[in-house]
Amino acid sequence: MKALILVGGFGTRLRPLTLSLPKPLVDFANKPMILHQIEALKAIGVDEVVLAINYEPEQLLVMSKFSNDVEATLGIKITCSQETEPLGTAGPLALARDKLVDGSGQPFFVLNSDVISDYPLEEMIAFHNAHGGEASIMVTKVDEPSKYGVVVMEEATGRVERFVEKPKLFVGNKINAGIYLLNPSVLDRIELRPTSIEKEIFPQIAEAEKLYAMLLPGFWMDIGQPRDYITGLRLYLDSLRKKSPSKLATGPHILGNVLVDETAEIGEGCLIGPNVAIGPGCVVESGVRLSHCTVMRGVHVKRYACISSSIIGWHSTVGQWARVENMSILGKNVYVCDEIYCNGGVVLHNKEIKSDILKPDIVM
């Protein structure tokens, strides 16, 4: 079985983290975002994954190296399909047609790379086989459907009737979750040009009464921007608590759900949690307070520092008694000096912060 992951976005909303890496390779819960998806696909028998990447030469180099590393580690075939111009969300499928179709007639998965969930892919295969349609999409319930494109469907069968973009009147509360299972015949509907699968292809299939939607059980989050990244981490750790609690940290210094890489060092008198991920090679000195945050690979947090609701990029340093909070994002190799207050600061790579950031600001 095969799958395609759409990884062509530029990740502008997660800058500065995406200035040096494609968004799918930014760490989430101590591993690249996209690796969560690849592991889930391999677990249900997918043996080849196509990464649909954008036209930038640098992305091909970085994603190819990642692909080689994952192939060697997981034993799953990964290939890249690179567009020469922006092709939207459907055009990349047409471009990768020869990689996705092998004559077996098997359906293939398509995933958006910035979606994090429980990935109930086996259930989706069973759903797809049962309804006998041409395509299945996963949907999730939201509290404010007027902000999204809503999927209107038959509750009994799951057949999609229509899509309504940002409805002013209530028509439903289910939205596209960015996980699809498609028959090869769907590719016959897609031309090799900039095309939206959500706005052009799926409405065609729905009109033919061959599109079905499965309600996603468990959590879901599009982690394309910092606040959603932090929320997604909380939901992911909640799920991990239910499925694999042994992977979470324990001890008198741990509060709630915390994920700590085995190579990280934690000092005495710390209070860590809830909803914290501490990456490989991190050093957290004594008396540190961490909550609702991600501390990526190689970060050094000095004594009595406090970090909350923030993302600390690779190999950065947070000084003694410093306070970083309110959706601050530190890029790679940032140095926050002792006793500095960072309130919603977005700090680019390789910067030294010597004075307080009193209100949300970008440090170039």
UniProtKB/Swiss-Prot annotation:
Gene3D superfamilies: Hexapeptide repeat proteins, Spore Coat Polysaccharide Biosynthesis Protein SpsA, Chain A. Disulfide bonds: none annotated. Keywords: GTP-binding, Nucleotide-binding, Nucleotidyltransferase, Transferase. One of its GO terms (biological process) is GDP-mannose biosynthetic process. Diphosphate binds at residues 9, 11-13, 23. Pfam families: GMPPB_C, NTP_transferase. The keyword Nuclease does not apply. GDP-alpha-D-mannose binds at residues 6-7, 88, 112, 114, 149, 176. It catalyses: alpha-D-mannose 1-phosphate + GTP + H(+) = GDP-alpha-D-mannose + diphosphate. Pathway: Nucleotide-sugar biosynthesis; GDP-alpha-D-mannose biosynthesis; GDP-alpha-D-mannose from alpha-D-mannose 1-phosphate (GTP route): step 1/1. PROSITE patterns: HEXAPEP_TRANSFERASES. One of its GO terms (cellular component) is cytoplasm. One of its GO terms (molecular function) is mannose-1-phosphate guanylyltransferase (GTP) activity. It comes from the Eukaryota. Its EC number is 2.7.7.13. The keyword Nucleotidyltransferase applies. Belongs to the transferase hexapeptide repeat family. Catalyzes a reaction of the Smirnoff-Wheeler pathway, the major route to ascorbate biosynthesis in plants. PANTHER family: SUGAR-1-PHOSPHATE GUANYL TRANSFERASE. This is Probable mannose-1-phosphate guanylyltransferase 2.
